[in-house]
């Protein structure tokens, strides 16, 4: 049975500590590192992570792998996977997370791939379809989202949900059994 959680996109706005700081503190405390491969979010997650002073202690780097060629060339996503499943798929999100983790030799890899719109949607990958991938060398997690809103809103929601889900992985919350239904 799948349980639902609701993520309030602005939950960290009014608190004294933002989620990117919480993530950074947890990574630093545990001696772990992170690398990020972004497609549909265009570097916005890296921007949030590096807003924290001292983030170079745990954030090794990131890439915007917007084209299929970049996904294959720089982080090792097999072009056959892209052809077979599409660039916006759980398989590609998984490979991106694994590939960026290997490329930067980090504990964790995080990835995003999706269709932010307003054009580019297909029956297989409609506007608002996003996959977020996480890899730690032993396990890989992928979360599928179907978001509504403008291009900017879809990107913003993807960033917030990515950070929230990653914080759950770091704190060993019951990530795999939760279905995310973002507000807004």
Feature-to-residue mapping (PLM):
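Short alpha-helical segments enriched in small residues
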Residues: 7-184
């Amino acid at each position: 049975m799948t349980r639902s959680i609701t993520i309030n996109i602005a939950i960290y706005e009014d608190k004294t500590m933002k989620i990117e700081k919480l993530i950074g503190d947890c990574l630093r405390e545990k001696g772990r590192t992170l690398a990020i491969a972004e497609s549909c979010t265009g570097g916005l997650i890296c921007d949030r992570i590096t807003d924290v002073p001292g983030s170079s202690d745990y954030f090794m780097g990131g890439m915007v792998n917007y084209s299929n060629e970049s996904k294959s060339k720089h982080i090792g996503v097999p072009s056959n996977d892209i052809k077979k499943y599409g660039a916006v798929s759980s398989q590609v999100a998984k490979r991106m997370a694994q590939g960026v983790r290997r490329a930067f030799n980090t504990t964790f890899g995080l990835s995003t791939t999706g269709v932010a719109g307003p054009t580019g949607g297909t029956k297989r990958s409609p506007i608002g379809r996003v996959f977020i991938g996480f890899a730690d060398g032993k396990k890989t997690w992928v979360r599928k989202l179907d978001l509504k809103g403008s291009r900017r809103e879809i990107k913003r929601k993807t960033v917030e949900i990515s950070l929230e889900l990653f914080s759950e992985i770091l704190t060993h919350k019951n990530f795999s059994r939760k279905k995310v239904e973002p507000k807004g």
